[in-house]
Amino acid sequence: MNRKFSLTAALALAWLTVSALPDAANAGQKGRNGLTVVELYTSQGCSSCPPADRLLGRLAKQSGILALSFHVDYWDYIGWKDPYGSPSNSRRQRDYKRTFNRFYVYTPQMVVGGMFEVTGFDAAAVLAGIKQASLAPNVPIDLSRDGAGDLRILISASPNPIRTAVWLALFDMENKTRVRRGENSGRTIVNYNVVRDFKKSAIGTAPPRR
């Protein structure tokens, strides 16, 4: 198991959260090169999910993309308890359900840049969403460590008021699981960038740079 605390995720997810908010259209620099966050909502108990898991694995290797797997727990009842499923991931997906005005949650679902949702194994739709999301405004962010080794994230002020949140992700880069029950019984499933912890970071106000 290769677990990684993603500082890159902090940058990208800060952008993600801002980009999905109403005032974001006037923020940042349009077309600025940055990361596009792709969230896969998946479950080892879902027979339709392995193709989406493999697609996310390919996306995870591409530059300019932060691909993350959020395992949900609402399929656990059909025979296999996903070891990475969590209620918090299911809640996050339900929040997206309201954002995108959907009547239900489903797997596999990919959310691209916080702006588009597509079926998780539809590679053409996912790539089209990534292309579109990469054109969205970005909020300039600087990442550094102080003398004590603490992480500092500086989000530049914008002339237009925006709401900003910074999320930090801890994820396993690759996990292999032999599924013994449920729809995927007998299969070995490989999951990539499996989110194990996902937290909102506190934001304070720093004095302006001189």
Language model regions located:
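Solvent-exposed, well-ordered amphipathic alpha-helical segments
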Residues: 18, 24-36, 69, 127, ...
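Bacterial N-terminal signal peptides
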Residues: 8-20
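Active-site-proximal cofactor/substrate-binding loop regions of enzyme domains
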Residues: 23-106
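G-domain G4 guanine-recognition motif of GTPases
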Residues: 71, 114-115
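Positively charged n-region of N-terminal signal peptides that target proteins for export
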Residues: 1-5
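Short, conserved sequence motifs used for protein processing/export or organelle targeting and
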Residues: 83-109, 115-210
